[in-house]
Amino acid sequence: MKKRISRIICTLLCCAPIAISAQTSEKITSPVNLYKEGKELFQEKNYAAAIPALKAFVKQKPTASLLQDAEYMLVSSAYELKDKNRIELLRKYLDRYPDTPYANRIYSLLASCYFYEGKYDEALALFNSTRLDLLGNEERDDRTYQLATCYMKTDNLKEAAIWFETLRASSPKYAKDCSYYLAYIRYTQKRYDEALKDFLPLQDDPKYKELVPYYIAEIYAIKKNYDKAQIVAQNYLSAYPNNEHAAEMYRILGDAYYHFGQYHQAVEAFTGYLDRDHSAPRRDALYMLGLSYYQTKVYSKAAEMLGQVTTANDALTQNAY
């Protein structure tokens, strides 16, 4: 009898860990815990880790409201992780849940996807279906920046400027980017004083210091402020001799030397421009180079350069003759 009781006790003791393990495993993989785990990881922006738990939860056939939430987190995670099928997943979610409370954010994510693909018209159409003011602050600013850029890329500079101004006033993160694009827009509109006002503070900014000096020097030259144009161009060429804007800086430098009457230096600078610019050179630069050669008595070169200017029936051609 004692032996029988001992065997029963041993059997129970051996089975107990298995039963406890099964209960623990069931507790961990229960729908409630899977949902809780996936949601916590999603809120922590640990999207890759959130996906397995959320997918496992969806397989448990939960209630409609929780299923909608879980699938929202899944498609949002696909967006954040740049899943190649993210556009399709986001659109399918909207088709499945047309009345979802997450529709506004889903539209904003779709717009962002098209923005990154360079499909600016498609992005704009979706942004127009979105209330950006209902997004979280960080995401609102990101989408506003994308919206403004879309307008600029589609040549709607008026709307682009409005949105860049709006964002600059509210977002320290994007303030300098907005200032640059606003300055660029003003530059293209020939509103040079306004452009210069926004370009100047960006001269020492790490992101823009190799870019804005060209516009600053060009504006100075356009406004016939040749001494400042010369200084900016010389400093730039000393710092960034191989930059893509170096050719234009040599042209601006040649422009300044020409108007100072320093024709030898003008020839040298304009030659630097032609050596680096492999596109069609500007006719006004060829004209000034031709006259600089003439002033330095290199008449054959003067004739060659001025001959290249007479390709259109305009004042520059008349002056070249």
Label each residue range with its predicted role.
Residues 10-17:
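Bacterial N-terminal signal peptides
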Residues 2-8, 20-321:
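Acidic, polar-rich low-complexity tracts and alpha-helical solenoid repeat scaffolds
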